[in-house]
Amino acid sequence: MRLGTLLCQLVLASATTSAKWIVPGARWRATDGSLVNAHAGGVTRDAGTGKFFWFGEYKVQGQEEGGGVSVYSSSDLVTWEPHGLALEPIEGHPHISNEDIIQRPKVVYSEATRQYHMWWHADNRTYGELLQGLAVSDNITGPYTYVDATAPLGNWSQDFGMFVDQKDGRAYAQYSNGDRREGRDVYLTSFNENITALDEVVHRFDKYDLEAPNIVQTDKSYFALMSHKTGYRPNNVVAFRADSLSGPWSQPFIIAPLNTRTFNSQSGFNLRINGTKKTTYIYMGDQWDSNSLWESRYIWLPMEINEEEKSLELVWHDVYDLNVETGEITPIEGTTYYNMEATTTGKAYHQEATFASDKTIVTGIYGNDSKATFHNVEGSGKPQWVSFYYQNTDDMGFGDQPGGTPDRINGTWQLRRISSVIVNNKTEELQTLYQRDTHKGIILSSPLMLNLDKGSHNTITIGGLYNGHDYKGADIDRIVVYPPEE
Protein backbone atom coordinates (compact mmCIF):
# COMPACT_ATOMS: atom_id res chain seq x y z
CA MET A 1 0.00 0.00 0.00
CA ARG A 2 1.33 3.43 -0.90
CA LEU A 3 1.90 5.93 1.91
CA GLY A 4 -0.49 8.44 0.30
CA THR A 5 -3.31 5.92 0.26
CA LEU A 6 -2.64 4.98 3.89
CA LEU A 7 -2.64 8.63 4.98
CA CYS A 8 -5.88 9.22 3.08
CA GLN A 9 -7.55 6.28 4.78
CA LEU A 10 -6.37 7.41 8.20
CA VAL A 11 -7.72 10.91 7.65
CA LEU A 12 -11.08 9.60 6.46
CA ALA A 13 -11.31 7.14 9.34
CA SER A 14 -10.60 9.85 11.91
CA ALA A 15 -13.19 12.06 10.29
CA THR A 16 -15.95 9.48 10.28
CA THR A 17 -15.30 8.22 13.81
CA SER A 18 -16.11 11.72 15.09
CA ALA A 19 -19.14 12.06 12.82
CA LYS A 20 -21.95 14.46 13.66
CA TRP A 21 -24.32 13.85 10.78
CA ILE A 22 -26.26 10.96 9.32
CA VAL A 23 -25.26 10.23 5.72
CA PRO A 24 -27.49 7.56 4.13
CA GLY A 25 -25.58 5.05 2.01
CA ALA A 26 -22.13 6.11 3.21
CA ARG A 27 -19.44 3.94 4.72
CA TRP A 28 -20.24 4.41 8.41
CA ARG A 29 -17.36 3.91 10.80
CA ALA A 30 -17.32 3.03 14.48
CA THR A 31 -15.20 4.82 17.08
CA ASP A 32 -12.31 2.42 16.45
CA GLY A 33 -12.27 3.28 12.73
CA SER A 34 -13.75 -0.01 11.55
CA LEU A 35 -16.82 -0.15 9.33
CA VAL A 36 -20.07 -0.55 11.27
CA ASN A 37 -21.09 -4.17 10.72
CA ALA A 38 -24.69 -4.63 11.92
CA HIS A 39 -26.89 -5.61 8.99
CA ALA A 40 -30.66 -6.22 9.02
CA GLY A 41 -30.85 -5.55 12.72
CA GLY A 42 -32.60 -3.25 15.14
CA VAL A 43 -31.94 -0.48 17.64
CA THR A 44 -32.91 -0.76 21.32
CA ARG A 45 -32.90 2.27 23.59
CA ASP A 46 -31.91 1.48 27.15
CA ALA A 47 -34.36 3.09 29.56
CA GLY A 48 -31.77 3.53 32.29
CA THR A 49 -28.99 5.23 30.35
CA GLY A 50 -30.88 6.60 27.36
CA LYS A 51 -28.24 5.04 25.11
CA PHE A 52 -29.06 3.40 21.81
CA PHE A 53 -27.84 -0.15 21.16
CA TRP A 54 -27.66 -1.35 17.57
CA PHE A 55 -27.75 -5.11 16.96
CA GLY A 56 -27.25 -6.65 13.54
CA GLU A 57 -25.90 -9.49 11.44
CA TYR A 58 -22.11 -9.65 11.39
CA LYS A 59 -20.88 -10.23 7.83
CA VAL A 60 -17.34 -10.50 6.49
CA GLN A 61 -15.92 -11.70 3.20
CA GLY A 62 -16.19 -15.47 3.15
CA GLN A 63 -18.67 -15.51 6.06
CA GLU A 64 -21.80 -13.78 4.81
CA GLU A 65 -24.10 -15.89 7.02
CA GLY A 66 -23.69 -17.41 10.47
CA GLY A 67 -21.25 -14.77 11.66
CA GLY A 68 -23.19 -14.00 14.82
CA VAL A 69 -24.82 -10.80 16.07
CA SER A 70 -22.76 -7.65 16.59
CA VAL A 71 -23.67 -4.78 18.93
CA TYR A 72 -22.77 -1.09 19.03
CA SER A 73 -23.80 1.71 21.40
CA SER A 74 -24.39 5.41 20.84
CA SER A 75 -25.85 8.41 22.63
CA ASP A 76 -26.62 10.31 19.41
CA LEU A 77 -27.29 7.66 16.68
CA VAL A 78 -24.17 8.85 14.85
CA THR A 79 -21.10 7.97 16.94
CA TRP A 80 -21.09 4.20 17.40
CA GLU A 81 -18.89 2.34 19.89
CA PRO A 82 -18.33 -1.35 19.06
CA HIS A 83 -18.87 -4.03 21.73
CA GLY A 84 -18.00 -7.09 19.68
CA LEU A 85 -20.39 -9.99 19.21
CA ALA A 86 -23.43 -10.09 21.48
CA LEU A 87 -24.25 -13.58 20.18
CA GLU A 88 -21.28 -15.65 19.08
CA PRO A 89 -21.53 -18.70 16.82
CA ILE A 90 -20.75 -22.03 18.48
CA GLU A 91 -19.07 -24.69 16.38
CA GLY A 92 -21.31 -27.69 15.88
CA HIS A 93 -24.34 -26.07 17.50
CA PRO A 94 -27.65 -27.10 15.87
CA HIS A 95 -28.88 -23.50 15.47
CA ILE A 96 -26.08 -20.94 16.03
CA SER A 97 -23.05 -22.41 14.30
CA ASN A 98 -21.20 -20.73 11.44
CA GLU A 99 -23.18 -23.00 9.12
CA ASP A 100 -26.55 -21.67 10.29
CA ILE A 101 -28.70 -18.69 9.41
CA ILE A 102 -28.78 -16.01 12.13
CA GLN A 103 -30.78 -13.19 10.59
CA ARG A 104 -32.68 -10.02 11.55
CA PRO A 105 -31.91 -9.99 15.31
CA LYS A 106 -34.00 -7.81 17.65
CA VAL A 107 -33.53 -7.19 21.38
CA VAL A 108 -36.05 -6.16 24.07
CA TYR A 109 -35.94 -6.04 27.84
CA SER A 110 -38.24 -8.40 29.75
CA GLU A 111 -39.45 -6.91 33.03
CA ALA A 112 -40.63 -10.36 34.10
CA THR A 113 -37.26 -12.09 33.73
CA ARG A 114 -35.13 -8.97 34.25
CA GLN A 115 -33.07 -10.00 31.27
CA TYR A 116 -32.56 -8.83 27.72
CA HIS A 117 -34.14 -11.14 25.18
CA MET A 118 -32.75 -11.48 21.66
CA TRP A 119 -35.00 -12.96 18.97
CA TRP A 120 -34.04 -13.72 15.36
CA HIS A 121 -34.81 -15.80 12.29
CA ALA A 122 -33.08 -19.13 12.95
CA ASP A 123 -32.56 -21.49 10.04
CA ASN A 124 -30.25 -23.79 8.14
CA ARG A 125 -28.53 -22.86 4.88
CA THR A 126 -31.36 -24.30 2.77
CA TYR A 127 -34.02 -22.32 4.66
CA GLY A 128 -35.70 -25.59 5.50
CA GLU A 129 -36.38 -25.00 9.20
CA LEU A 130 -37.93 -21.49 9.35
CA LEU A 131 -37.69 -21.04 13.14
CA GLN A 132 -37.41 -18.21 15.65
CA GLY A 133 -34.38 -18.20 17.93
CA LEU A 134 -34.19 -16.89 21.50
CA ALA A 135 -31.12 -15.98 23.55
CA VAL A 136 -30.93 -14.07 26.84
CA SER A 137 -28.44 -11.95 28.75
CA ASP A 138 -28.24 -9.99 32.00
CA ASN A 139 -26.38 -7.24 30.13
CA ILE A 140 -27.65 -5.48 27.03
CA THR A 141 -24.35 -5.93 25.19
CA GLY A 142 -24.19 -9.61 26.07
CA PRO A 143 -22.89 -12.19 25.91
CA TYR A 144 -26.25 -13.77 25.06
CA THR A 145 -26.91 -17.40 25.96
CA TYR A 146 -28.87 -19.53 23.51
CA VAL A 147 -32.21 -20.78 24.86
CA ASP A 148 -34.14 -22.37 22.01
CA ALA A 149 -35.28 -22.20 18.39
CA THR A 150 -38.96 -22.87 17.86
CA ALA A 151 -41.72 -22.83 15.27
CA PRO A 152 -44.06 -19.96 16.23
CA LEU A 153 -47.39 -21.51 17.22
CA GLY A 154 -46.43 -24.41 14.96
CA ASN A 155 -46.03 -22.17 11.90
CA TRP A 156 -43.05 -21.21 9.74
CA SER A 157 -41.07 -18.01 10.29
CA GLN A 158 -38.67 -16.33 7.91
CA ASP A 159 -37.93 -12.57 7.94
CA PHE A 160 -38.39 -11.46 11.54
CA GLY A 161 -39.43 -8.16 13.08
CA MET A 162 -40.26 -7.06 16.61
CA PHE A 163 -42.38 -4.27 18.01
CA VAL A 164 -43.21 -2.98 21.51
CA ASP A 165 -46.46 -1.02 21.79
CA GLN A 166 -45.81 2.28 23.54
CA LYS A 167 -49.35 2.33 24.93
CA ASP A 168 -49.11 -0.77 27.11
CA GLY A 169 -45.57 -2.16 26.70
CA ARG A 170 -46.80 -5.36 25.03
CA ALA A 171 -44.28 -6.99 22.67
CA TYR A 172 -45.19 -8.39 19.26
CA ALA A 173 -43.42 -10.38 16.57
CA GLN A 174 -43.88 -9.82 12.86
CA TYR A 175 -42.71 -12.52 10.51
CA SER A 176 -43.20 -13.79 6.99
CA ASN A 177 -43.97 -17.50 6.85
CA GLY A 178 -41.80 -18.51 3.94
CA ASP A 179 -42.07 -18.95 0.20
CA ARG A 180 -44.02 -22.20 0.05
CA ARG A 181 -47.40 -22.05 -1.66
CA GLU A 182 -49.01 -22.67 1.75
CA GLY A 183 -47.15 -19.67 3.16
CA ARG A 184 -46.58 -16.22 1.68
CA ASP A 185 -48.30 -14.47 4.59
CA VAL A 186 -47.00 -12.02 7.18
CA TYR A 187 -48.08 -12.60 10.78
CA LEU A 188 -48.45 -10.10 13.61
CA THR A 189 -48.40 -12.13 16.83
CA SER A 190 -48.26 -11.13 20.49
CA PHE A 191 -45.67 -12.42 22.95
CA ASN A 192 -46.51 -13.66 26.43
CA GLU A 193 -45.73 -11.34 29.34
CA ASN A 194 -42.27 -12.88 29.81
CA ILE A 195 -41.40 -12.40 26.11
CA THR A 196 -40.32 -16.03 26.05
CA ALA A 197 -42.91 -17.37 23.59
CA LEU A 198 -45.68 -16.24 21.26
CA ASP A 199 -49.25 -16.61 22.46
CA GLU A 200 -51.79 -15.24 19.95
CA VAL A 201 -52.03 -14.21 16.31
CA VAL A 202 -53.35 -10.65 16.22
CA HIS A 203 -53.50 -10.25 12.43
CA ARG A 204 -52.42 -12.07 9.28
CA PHE A 205 -51.52 -10.15 6.13
CA ASP A 206 -52.84 -12.87 3.88
CA LYS A 207 -51.02 -13.84 0.65
CA TYR A 208 -49.41 -10.45 0.02
CA ASP A 209 -46.10 -12.38 -0.24
CA LEU A 210 -44.04 -9.70 1.52
CA GLU A 211 -41.12 -9.76 3.95
CA ALA A 212 -38.87 -7.59 6.17
CA PRO A 213 -41.80 -6.39 8.32
CA ASN A 214 -41.69 -3.67 10.96
CA ILE A 215 -44.25 -1.38 12.57
CA VAL A 216 -44.26 2.40 13.03
CA GLN A 217 -46.48 3.60 15.86
CA THR A 218 -47.78 7.17 16.08
CA ASP A 219 -50.19 8.52 18.68
CA LYS A 220 -53.11 7.65 16.41
CA SER A 221 -52.00 5.03 13.92
CA TYR A 222 -49.97 1.92 13.25
CA PHE A 223 -48.09 1.62 9.95
CA ALA A 224 -46.78 -1.81 8.95
CA LEU A 225 -43.83 -1.50 6.54
CA MET A 226 -42.89 -4.47 4.35
CA SER A 227 -40.67 -5.27 1.40
CA HIS A 228 -41.44 -7.26 -1.72
CA LYS A 229 -39.56 -10.54 -2.06
CA THR A 230 -36.82 -9.71 -4.54
CA GLY A 231 -33.90 -11.20 -2.64
CA TYR A 232 -31.05 -8.72 -2.28
CA ARG A 233 -32.42 -6.57 -5.11
CA PRO A 234 -34.16 -3.41 -3.82
CA ASN A 235 -37.84 -2.80 -4.48
CA ASN A 236 -40.71 -0.46 -3.67
CA VAL A 237 -41.36 -0.89 0.07
CA VAL A 238 -45.03 -0.60 0.99
CA ALA A 239 -46.96 0.31 4.14
CA PHE A 240 -50.35 -0.66 5.54
CA ARG A 241 -52.17 1.60 8.05
CA ALA A 242 -54.59 0.79 10.87
CA ASP A 243 -56.08 2.34 14.01
CA SER A 244 -55.62 -0.94 15.86
CA LEU A 245 -53.11 -3.77 15.58
CA SER A 246 -55.97 -6.18 14.98
CA GLY A 247 -57.12 -4.09 12.04
CA PRO A 248 -58.80 -3.46 9.77
CA TRP A 249 -55.63 -2.63 7.83
CA SER A 250 -55.55 -0.51 4.70
CA GLN A 251 -54.44 -1.52 1.25
CA PRO A 252 -50.63 -1.29 0.90
CA PHE A 253 -49.13 1.90 -0.54
CA ILE A 254 -45.61 2.78 -1.69
CA ILE A 255 -43.65 4.93 0.79
CA ALA A 256 -40.93 6.45 -1.43
CA PRO A 257 -40.96 8.15 -4.84
CA LEU A 258 -41.99 5.57 -7.43
CA ASN A 259 -39.16 3.68 -9.13
CA THR A 260 -36.51 4.81 -6.66
CA ARG A 261 -36.88 1.32 -5.14
CA THR A 262 -37.08 2.97 -1.73
CA PHE A 263 -33.82 4.76 -2.50
CA ASN A 264 -32.28 1.35 -3.21
CA SER A 265 -33.02 -0.04 0.24
CA GLN A 266 -35.05 -2.69 2.03
CA SER A 267 -37.16 -2.09 5.12
CA GLY A 268 -35.86 -3.65 8.30
CA PHE A 269 -36.49 -1.49 11.35
CA ASN A 270 -37.64 1.94 12.44
CA LEU A 271 -37.15 4.11 15.47
CA ARG A 272 -39.49 6.56 17.15
CA ILE A 273 -37.75 9.44 18.94
CA ASN A 274 -39.92 11.23 21.48
CA GLY A 275 -38.12 14.57 21.46
CA THR A 276 -38.77 17.58 23.65
CA LYS A 277 -39.83 19.60 20.61
CA LYS A 278 -41.21 16.99 18.23
CA THR A 279 -41.67 13.28 17.69
CA THR A 280 -39.50 11.98 14.88
CA TYR A 281 -39.70 8.67 13.04
CA ILE A 282 -36.59 7.20 11.40
CA TYR A 283 -36.71 4.52 8.69
CA MET A 284 -33.73 2.19 9.11
CA GLY A 285 -33.22 0.26 5.89
CA ASP A 286 -30.48 -1.90 4.44
CA GLN A 287 -28.84 -1.12 1.11
CA TRP A 288 -27.74 -4.59 0.12
CA ASP A 289 -24.82 -5.38 -2.16
CA SER A 290 -25.47 -8.91 -3.39
CA ASN A 291 -22.02 -9.07 -5.01
CA SER A 292 -20.32 -8.41 -1.67
CA LEU A 293 -22.79 -8.55 1.21
CA TRP A 294 -20.18 -7.38 3.70
CA GLU A 295 -20.09 -4.08 1.74
CA SER A 296 -23.82 -3.46 2.23
CA ARG A 297 -24.72 -0.02 3.58
CA TYR A 298 -27.46 1.56 5.68
CA ILE A 299 -30.21 3.95 4.60
CA TRP A 300 -31.61 5.88 7.57
CA LEU A 301 -34.16 8.52 6.61
CA PRO A 302 -36.87 10.55 8.35
CA MET A 303 -40.46 9.54 7.73
CA GLU A 304 -43.06 12.23 7.16
CA ILE A 305 -46.42 11.10 8.56
CA ASN A 306 -49.69 12.92 7.94
CA GLU A 307 -52.43 11.62 10.20
CA GLU A 308 -55.19 13.46 8.37
CA GLU A 309 -54.11 12.07 5.01
CA LYS A 310 -53.23 8.73 6.63
CA SER A 311 -49.95 8.78 4.74
CA LEU A 312 -46.31 7.95 5.40
CA GLU A 313 -43.46 9.03 3.12
CA LEU A 314 -39.68 8.79 3.25
CA VAL A 315 -37.86 12.11 2.98
CA TRP A 316 -34.46 12.00 1.28
CA HIS A 317 -31.53 14.02 2.61
CA ASP A 318 -27.94 13.48 1.46
CA VAL A 319 -26.70 14.68 4.83
CA TYR A 320 -28.68 15.67 7.91
CA ASP A 321 -28.33 16.40 11.59
CA LEU A 322 -30.60 14.59 14.05
CA ASN A 323 -30.94 15.92 17.59
CA VAL A 324 -32.07 12.93 19.65
CA GLU A 325 -33.00 15.15 22.59
CA THR A 326 -35.32 17.55 20.77
CA GLY A 327 -36.27 15.26 17.90
CA GLU A 328 -35.40 17.97 15.39
CA ILE A 329 -33.90 17.19 11.99
CA THR A 330 -31.79 19.75 10.15
CA PRO A 331 -30.82 19.05 6.51
CA ILE A 332 -27.26 20.18 5.77
CA GLU A 333 -26.90 22.52 2.81
CA GLY A 334 -24.18 21.98 0.24
CA THR A 335 -22.84 23.57 -2.94
CA THR A 336 -24.02 22.02 -6.21
CA TYR A 337 -21.85 21.60 -9.31
CA TYR A 338 -23.75 20.57 -12.46
CA ASN A 339 -22.45 18.22 -15.12
CA MET A 340 -22.45 20.98 -17.77
CA GLU A 341 -19.59 22.54 -15.80
CA ALA A 342 -17.57 19.32 -16.09
CA THR A 343 -15.14 18.49 -18.90
CA THR A 344 -15.01 15.04 -20.49
CA THR A 345 -12.34 12.85 -22.05
CA GLY A 346 -12.39 9.87 -24.39
CA LYS A 347 -15.89 8.64 -25.22
CA ALA A 348 -17.57 10.33 -22.26
CA TYR A 349 -19.88 13.13 -23.38
CA HIS A 350 -22.82 15.35 -22.43
CA GLN A 351 -26.15 13.99 -23.60
CA GLU A 352 -29.59 15.57 -23.59
CA ALA A 353 -31.65 14.26 -20.65
CA THR A 354 -34.91 16.04 -19.90
CA PHE A 355 -35.16 14.36 -16.49
CA ALA A 356 -31.74 15.60 -15.34
CA SER A 357 -31.19 18.70 -13.24
CA ASP A 358 -29.90 20.87 -16.10
CA LYS A 359 -31.42 18.81 -18.95
CA THR A 360 -28.11 17.05 -19.70
CA ILE A 361 -26.17 14.17 -18.23
CA VAL A 362 -22.60 12.91 -18.69
CA THR A 363 -22.64 9.39 -20.10
CA GLY A 364 -20.04 7.04 -21.58
CA ILE A 365 -17.76 7.06 -18.53
CA TYR A 366 -15.51 4.00 -18.84
CA GLY A 367 -12.27 2.97 -17.18
CA ASN A 368 -9.39 5.40 -17.10
CA ASP A 369 -9.85 6.69 -20.65
CA SER A 370 -13.36 8.15 -20.65
CA LYS A 371 -13.88 10.39 -17.64
CA ALA A 372 -15.62 13.51 -16.37
CA THR A 373 -13.88 16.21 -14.34
CA PHE A 374 -15.47 18.93 -12.22
CA HIS A 375 -13.30 22.03 -11.88
CA ASN A 376 -13.08 24.95 -9.45
CA VAL A 377 -14.62 22.99 -6.61
CA GLU A 378 -14.56 24.86 -3.30
CA GLY A 379 -12.88 22.99 -0.45
CA SER A 380 -12.20 23.59 3.23
CA GLY A 381 -8.91 21.74 3.68
CA LYS A 382 -10.75 19.18 5.82
CA PRO A 383 -12.61 15.96 4.94
CA GLN A 384 -16.01 16.71 3.41
CA TRP A 385 -18.98 14.68 2.24
CA VAL A 386 -19.64 14.81 -1.48
CA SER A 387 -22.83 13.35 -2.99
CA PHE A 388 -22.66 12.07 -6.57
CA TYR A 389 -26.04 12.16 -8.34
CA TYR A 390 -26.16 9.51 -11.04
CA GLN A 391 -28.19 7.21 -13.28
CA ASN A 392 -27.26 3.53 -13.82
CA THR A 393 -29.68 1.52 -15.97
CA ASP A 394 -27.81 -1.81 -16.23
CA ASP A 395 -30.65 -3.79 -14.65
CA MET A 396 -33.49 -1.29 -14.65
CA GLY A 397 -36.03 -3.86 -15.81
CA PHE A 398 -36.58 -5.85 -12.63
CA GLY A 399 -39.68 -5.03 -10.63
CA ASP A 400 -41.24 -6.02 -7.33
CA GLN A 401 -42.02 -9.60 -8.31
CA PRO A 402 -40.10 -12.52 -6.74
CA GLY A 403 -37.36 -13.93 -8.91
CA GLY A 404 -37.30 -11.75 -11.99
CA THR A 405 -34.67 -11.70 -14.70
CA PRO A 406 -31.95 -9.30 -15.79
CA ASP A 407 -32.62 -6.96 -18.71
CA ARG A 408 -30.59 -9.12 -21.04
CA ILE A 409 -31.91 -12.52 -22.15
CA ASN A 410 -29.71 -15.19 -20.57
CA GLY A 411 -27.80 -12.39 -18.87
CA THR A 412 -26.52 -12.12 -15.31
CA TRP A 413 -27.39 -9.56 -12.68
CA GLN A 414 -25.03 -6.58 -12.52
CA LEU A 415 -26.89 -4.40 -9.99
CA ARG A 416 -24.14 -1.82 -9.52
CA ARG A 417 -21.34 0.04 -11.21
CA ILE A 418 -18.19 1.21 -9.49
CA SER A 419 -16.64 4.55 -10.34
CA SER A 420 -13.20 5.83 -9.50
CA VAL A 421 -13.06 9.26 -7.86
CA ILE A 422 -9.80 11.18 -7.82
CA VAL A 423 -9.27 14.60 -6.21
CA ASN A 424 -6.67 16.96 -7.68
CA ASN A 425 -5.12 14.21 -9.82
CA LYS A 426 -3.86 12.37 -6.72
CA THR A 427 -4.23 8.87 -8.17
CA GLU A 428 -2.65 7.32 -5.08
CA GLU A 429 -5.72 8.48 -3.11
CA LEU A 430 -8.31 7.00 -5.49
CA GLN A 431 -11.71 6.39 -3.88
CA THR A 432 -14.31 3.80 -4.98
CA LEU A 433 -17.88 4.98 -5.55
CA TYR A 434 -20.60 2.31 -5.62
CA GLN A 435 -23.57 3.25 -7.83
CA ARG A 436 -26.56 0.91 -7.51
CA ASP A 437 -28.91 0.41 -10.42
CA THR A 438 -31.71 2.84 -11.16
CA HIS A 439 -34.71 2.92 -13.43
CA LYS A 440 -34.31 4.93 -16.63
CA GLY A 441 -34.85 8.58 -15.85
CA ILE A 442 -34.37 8.17 -12.09
CA ILE A 443 -31.52 10.09 -10.48
CA LEU A 444 -30.18 8.85 -7.12
CA SER A 445 -27.11 9.78 -5.10
CA SER A 446 -24.15 8.01 -3.55
CA PRO A 447 -21.82 9.70 -1.01
CA LEU A 448 -18.07 9.74 -0.43
CA MET A 449 -15.90 11.47 2.15
CA LEU A 450 -13.19 13.36 0.22
CA ASN A 451 -10.17 15.47 1.14
CA LEU A 452 -10.46 18.79 -0.69
CA ASP A 453 -7.75 21.43 -0.45
CA LYS A 454 -8.71 24.81 0.97
CA GLY A 455 -9.81 27.13 -1.81
CA SER A 456 -11.63 26.89 -5.13
CA HIS A 457 -8.96 25.22 -7.26
CA ASN A 458 -9.99 21.60 -6.58
CA THR A 459 -10.82 19.09 -9.30
CA ILE A 460 -12.90 15.92 -8.91
CA THR A 461 -12.44 13.34 -11.67
CA ILE A 462 -14.81 10.40 -12.17
CA GLY A 463 -13.83 7.29 -14.13
CA GLY A 464 -14.83 3.62 -14.16
CA LEU A 465 -13.59 0.60 -12.21
CA TYR A 466 -14.11 -3.11 -12.73
CA ASN A 467 -17.43 -4.25 -11.25
CA GLY A 468 -17.23 -7.92 -12.15
CA HIS A 469 -18.57 -7.34 -15.68
CA ASP A 470 -16.95 -4.25 -17.20
CA TYR A 471 -15.42 -0.86 -16.37
CA LYS A 472 -18.49 1.34 -16.80
CA GLY A 473 -19.11 4.25 -14.49
CA ALA A 474 -22.65 5.51 -14.01
CA ASP A 475 -24.02 8.56 -15.84
CA ILE A 476 -23.36 11.72 -13.81
CA ASP A 477 -25.97 14.41 -13.25
CA ARG A 478 -24.32 16.61 -10.60
CA ILE A 479 -22.28 16.60 -7.41
CA VAL A 480 -23.04 18.34 -4.12
CA VAL A 481 -20.18 19.31 -1.79
CA TYR A 482 -21.05 19.65 1.90
CA PRO A 483 -19.21 21.59 4.61
CA PRO A 484 -16.94 19.69 7.02
CA GLU A 485 -18.41 18.23 10.20
CA GLU A 486 -17.30 20.66 12.88
Give short role names for the model-derived ranges.
Residues 1-19:
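Fungal secretory targeting signals
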Residues 323-486:
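Extracytoplasmic
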Residues 273, 284-288, 465:
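Short, loop-centered acidic/histidine patches that primarily coordinate divalent metals
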Residues 17-210, 217-221, 226-261, 278, ...:
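Beta-rich carbohydrate-recognition and catalytic domains
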Residues 221-222, 235, 266, 276-282, ...:
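A short pocket-lining beta-strand/turn micro-motif at the edge of beta-sheets
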Residues 161, 263-273:
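Short aromatic loop motif centered on NTY/YTY
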